[in-house]
Amino acid sequence: MSKYKRIFTIVIDSLGIGAMNDSEKYGDVNVDTLGHIAESVDTFNIPNLQKMGIANLHPIKHVAPVENPIGYQAKMAEASVGKDTMTGHWEMMGLHITKPFKTFTDTGFPQELLDELTARTGHKIVGNKSASGTEILDELGEHQIATGDMIVYTSADSVLQICGQEETFGLEELYRCCEIARELTLKDEWKVGRIIARPYLGTKKGEFKRTSNRHDYALKPYGRTVLNELKDNNFDVISVGKIKDIFDGEGITEGNKSKSSVHGMEQTLEIMDRDFTGFCFINLVDFDALWGHRRNPQGYAEELEKFDVNLGKVLEKLHEDDLLIITADHGNDPTYTGTDHTREYVPFLAYSPSMKGHGQLETPKTFATIGATIADNFGLKMPEGTIGESVLNKLV
């Protein structure tokens, strides 16, 4: 019989807790998402993360370590090459990514790809550079509305992003164009991790706002993950936020899209009221998309405080045979130069009301510790070719 009937893993997207040993290879020097956020604000109140021991793992201004934190804590290192969303999440579920996904940050996309995209979609392309979503809309949003051209851009991540104004370009047309882009970028030389549909509203510079109708078209995972094992063995695999997109639906039995990170936590609280056996995997993207990339430490701090209030409600709802794991998929230090992710350790905070002990675990060498622990709990073997060692027997 399983130790835990339900396991909830919440990914606070981009909440790194200090530079990994190899971070300088990624251009990241002295980065520290959580530490630098706390240093950027006058007050910082996260009592529930505090009692789960986050400040015991990592010094945080305004947040003291606690003598007896609930549950277990560890700093997790990333084994894979990269610092992006897909690499982080895929590794959590057992995959070891040894070749980074293709990026076009410095060059933009090849003309041959753009020509094919224009021929297949019927839209001319503007942009074709690395930019923040808000900047590119201010620069080209009015042009798109006037011409029907398609805004294509990228970032430091392995992504091809297409913007479309919902009312003039149309949501279905945007999705159609993204599906064509996904098909074209399955070629090895153009193989990006994700195509992202970026719909927006507004009619003039300074007023454009991206909507919650974003859609990600990810590559299928390179191999079987713990999610596949769970689903194939008739366990529930419920996703919240962009998890279903990240895994291209592989191993998911129920997907729930979120309008915001606060909404994602509300959805999680509703799911906690249901009887199920298996895994609920939650991604809260606003931390990364709204505050990390936009280099807004104050906004990030406020979002963490809102999250912490809802975390308190999650802790109250946990059953004796539930396990909660809180983690992140990479860093995105909002005080660092540029607008890109940062290569950092991430937190592993694990708690169940049935735990008698507490304390810090040794630093796991891979995010796949999470997937291995979940598989172990449900009596499943890790899929062939995956990595990760369970810490289930240490959670007592």
From Swiss-Prot:
Keyword presence, Lipid biosynthesis: no
Disulfide bonds: none
Co-factor note (free text): Binds 2 manganese ions.
List of residues binding Mn(2+) 1: 13, 329-330
Top-level taxonomic group: Bacteria
GO BP of this protein: 2-deoxyribose 1-phosphate catabolic process; 5-phosphoribose 1-diphosphate biosynthetic process; metabolic compound salvage; nucleotide metabolic process
Cofactor(s) needed for function: Mn(2+)
Subcellular location(s) of the protein: Cytoplasm
Pfam families in alphabetical order: Metalloenzyme (PF01676)
GO molecular function, one term: phosphopentomutase activity
Keywords (A to Z) from UniProt: Cytoplasm, Isomerase, Manganese, Metal-binding
NCBIfam families: deoB, PRK05362.1
Family of the protein in this entry: Belongs to the phosphopentomutase family.
Protein name per UniProt: Phosphopentomutase
Native species: Clostridium perfringens (strain SM101 / Type A)
